[in-house]
């Protein structure tokens, strides 16, 4: 499996800023916190998504993981793989593969796809960033070994100074992390989102539960108003017949952040020009009031950000 987290990447935020490099003090007040979740519940497999924009990113994106948007700027985590992990024939010391080598990135880019900042994250074998999320003050990023049941560093990044701060370390591959509100505990998912975690701000594990859903592996998540989060991701299924390729089933899910129970989910059949499901890599959702916008970077290396919008929703 690849990164297997929740990086929306889907990242979902209903907060915006007015300054160029994200002054948290300039955040506009949150409006209609529950509207996002209610609008999302109107989506189905029959929802029409219209592509509004394609922004070619003017830098090597490597293997994108998670994304969030603050004002007019986009923040995207990515892993640059220098040496791919190799599967063992038999597990060794509890691991199923080598560590590999790589570099963790948090890219900042503008609406024209121009790279403004490349923040390096990670240490040693922990070089694989996961899904990211903005809590109204800081961006939270997990950086793990590129293998399950391993180790992770949890950072928060000040979008004003662009400086990362290590918050704690934990003994599992954390594929994505977000904060429950600006001051709440941290919600996280493991490799393939098979396990849900709740941490306090110092890294103490408050709860650890199995994910009951096997529809998709959450790739990226972010808050969607009060008490809710939206996650995006994929699962790879075998093709029928003689094909040796994998079919990428994409999807979105709305979860209750307190109980981690699914409130609504739907498949996403949109694909990129390279044939990847758009929820394969980072996804960010934005509630416009009348519609929902979906920002996605599904392809590696030479990537484009694809922007879709739903038809008008009934927001009464």
Predicted regions and their residues:
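A short beta-strand motif characteristic of beta-propeller blades
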Residues: 51-57, 114-122, 163-168, 204-210, ...
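Short coil/turn segments that connect the beta-strands within blades of beta-propeller domains
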Residues: 71-72, 136-137, 182-184, 226-228, ...
